[in-house]
């Protein structure tokens, strides 16, 4: 006890630094972070095991079906790990006629498809050509407006120059007139004797007339004023095109390329149908159990991944919250240490002043050593009376029995007794701290494990808790399987056919620069549009003639004879917008283009899954459901006990 410090021998910066590594805060928040991410690790591992177990369960019952068209034999086999009882198996012989094409319907469907494709292309190309032609016309309007403005500016400058010449001549004549007037005045002042008639005649002869300039240059002034006040514009002119004039693509219906594509598609359909179904088919069928799981592997993985990401976001959010709380508590401790440091300095200064006043001594260290033991004993006996008295009795017994053999081991033993008695008698705050830690860790783990895996879509025909449905390979199964292969093949052929039409035929034949028929039609349509545009533009100028009065400006037609060739040279048909596919094309051929002449069945097969197998599968699912909750409960209990034991040891070590 002689090593107890009455005053902390640390400076204020050292105290601030020690607040960052305060044992209680560091242990508390470190254990919380470990609990958060430890729980996440347990959840992650458990979900991985569940996913692995689910994959195994999905693979427990499987069915393999194969249909051989070469030998016209369909075989189905099944394997299952469940106990099978009361399973009956029979074999059936099927004789089926071959599938055939409804060629009339297929030809009409192809023609309708191509007709709708051409109409769609005509509409798209017509709209696009009108938009591009209007844009071309707007560009020409902008250029023409710029030329008009430039011409008006040029004429304005020329008229200003002429008026400047007018002003120069006028000023010169005005100067000469003033000079003549001054000369006449001087002559009059010299008292020349002239009769009145002679004076009038001389005055009229000496007068300089400049009124003629008003009539000569007046027109220029008025024209300049008109040009300066001109506000006419042609950019607000809008073209109205004839929408009834569009390209006609009917000539493509008789092209050799299209007829060849049509023949190839029909031949490919016939070959595919002939391969998938022969003229006579003998099928040997055996019963099989087909599993329909509640969940597919991809859906399970996506759901478990979503739950894992949700828990991971919770862990990150909790980590950020407790990290902020840790630094907030550190700042609070620093503020408390600052206040305590000031109070201690005041108390030390007060004690030193009192000691100096009583003894005249200034050596505070000497008095600290003298009074240290007494003050420490008084402090312990006041704050912890019961442990102090018990420790005192234990030490007295040790000194009485073997005072000469007292060593460090016995001293440590006495301190250990002291710590135990202190925990029992005065450790209420320790137990409160432990209870608080237990409560916080419990809440953290509970919130992290409080989630629900959403139910996945089921494949069942009626409501029920069963996980597996049985399905028997009967005549309908065999027919459905063969038709499934045929539908898949027909869909692929139709898709390839439409891609070939879009990417090869349409792209190769829709070109204004290379196809003479399209070029002639486009030229005729553009001639009509050019004439209509020029007529509308002339009408527009006549209606807005008040803006053009007073200026001598000749506006030519908007579009010239070379506009058509210029537009055709820069316009390309939008083939990228007409390469869409029609999904109903394949569906119509699958539904009405394939003829099934019938199937004759001589026997059927039945299979059943035993009740014991169903119970085993159900029990396995229930165990899988409660497995996660059991892991969480025992894991939470183990974590809480470890935390409590850990904190007790830490406090014991700190008080030694």
UniProtKB/Swiss-Prot annotation:
The keyword Transmembrane applies. One of its GO terms (cellular component) is membrane. Its main location: membrane. It is a multi-pass membrane protein. The chain crosses the membrane at residues 16-36, 320-340, 422-442, 634-654. It comes from the Eukaryota. GO terms for biological process: karyogamy involved in conjugation with cellular fusion. Induction: By pheromone. Keywords: Membrane, Transmembrane, Transmembrane helix. It is found in: Membrane. This is Pheromone-regulated membrane protein 2. The lineage of its organism: Eukaryota, Fungi, Dikarya, Ascomycota, Saccharomycotina. The gene is PRM2.
């Amino acid at each position: 006890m002689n090593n107890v410090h009455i005053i902390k021998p640390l400076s204020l910066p050292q105290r601030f630094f020690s607040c960052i590594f305060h044992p209680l805060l560091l242990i508390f928040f470190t254990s919380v972070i470990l609990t958060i991410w430890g729980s996440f690790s347990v959840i992650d591992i458990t979900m991985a095991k569940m996913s692995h177990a689910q994959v195994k369960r999905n693979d427990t019952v499987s069915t393999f079906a194969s249909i051989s068209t070469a030998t016209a034999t369909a075989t189905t086999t099944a394997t299952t790990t469940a106990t099978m009882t009361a399973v009956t198996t029979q074999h059936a012989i099927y004789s089926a006629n071959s599938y055939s094409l409804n060629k009339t319907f297929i030809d009409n469907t192809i023609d309708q498809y191509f007709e709708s494709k051409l109409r769609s292309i005509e509409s798209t190309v017509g709209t696009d050509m009108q938009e591009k032609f209007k844009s071309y016309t707007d560009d020409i309007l902008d250029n023409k407006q710029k030329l008009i403005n430039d011409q008006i500016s040029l004429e304005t400058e020329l008229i200003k120059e002429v008026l400047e010449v007018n002003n120069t001549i006028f000023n010169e004549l005005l100067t000469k007139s003033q000079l003549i007037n001054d000369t006449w005045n001087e002559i009059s002042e010299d008292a020349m004797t002239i009769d009145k008639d002679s004076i009038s005649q001389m005055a009229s002869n000496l007068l300089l007339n400049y009124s003629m300039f008003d009539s000569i240059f007046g027109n220029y002034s008025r024209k300049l004023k008109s040009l300066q006040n001109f506000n006419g514009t042609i950019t607000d002119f809008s073209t109205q095109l004839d929408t009834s004039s569009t390209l006609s693509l009917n000539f493509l219906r008789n092209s050799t390329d299209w007829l060849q594509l049509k023949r190839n598609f029909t031949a490919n359909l016939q070959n595919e149908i002939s391969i998938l179904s022969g003229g006579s088919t003998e099928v040997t069928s055996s019963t099989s159990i087909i599993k329909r799981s509640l969940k597919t592997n991809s859906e399970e993985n996506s759901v478990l991944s979503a739950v894992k990401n949700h828990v991971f976001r919770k862990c990150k959010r909790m980590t950020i919250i407790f990290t902020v709380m840790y630094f907030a508590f550190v700042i609070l401790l620093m503020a408390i240490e600052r206040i305590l440091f000031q109070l201690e300095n005041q108390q030390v200064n007060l004690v030193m002043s009192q000691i100096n006043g009583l003894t005249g001594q200034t050596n505070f260290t000497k008095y600290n050593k003298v009074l240290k033991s007494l003050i420490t004993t008084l402090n312990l006996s006041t704050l912890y009376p019961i442990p102090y008295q018990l420790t005192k009795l234990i030490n007295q017994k040790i000194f009485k029995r073997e005072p000469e053999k007292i060593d460090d081991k016995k001293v440590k033993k006495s301190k250990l007794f002291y710590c135990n008695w202190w925990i029992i008698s005065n450790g209420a705050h320790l137990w409160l701290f432990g209870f608080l830690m237990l409560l916080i860790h419990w809440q953290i783990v509970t919130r992290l494990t409080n989630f629900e895996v959403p139910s996945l879509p089921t494949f069942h025909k009626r409501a029920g808790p069963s996980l597996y449905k049985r399905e028997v390979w009967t005549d309908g199964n065999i027919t459905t399987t063969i038709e499934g292969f045929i539908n898949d093949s027909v869909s692929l052929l139709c898709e390839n056919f439409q891609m070939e039409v879009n990417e090869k035929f349409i792209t190769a034949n829709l070109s204004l620069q290379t196809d003479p028929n399209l070029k002639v039609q486009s030229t005729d349509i553009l001639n009509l549009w050019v004439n209509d545009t020029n007529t509308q533009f002339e009408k527009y100028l006549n209606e807005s003639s008040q803006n053009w009065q007073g200026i001598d400006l000749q506006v030519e037609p908007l579009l010239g004879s070379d506009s058509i060739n210029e537009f055709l040279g820069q316009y390309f048909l939008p083939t990228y917008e007409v390469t869409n596919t029609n999904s109903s094309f394949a569906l119509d051929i699958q539904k009405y283009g394939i003829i099934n002449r019938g199937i004759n069945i001589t026997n059927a097969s039945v299979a059943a899954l035993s009740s014991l197998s169903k119970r085993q599968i159900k029990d396995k699912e229930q165990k899988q459901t409660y497995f996660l909750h059991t892991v969480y409960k025992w894991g939470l209990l183990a974590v809480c006990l470890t935390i409590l034991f850990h904190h007790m040891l830490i406090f014991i070590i700190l008080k030694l």
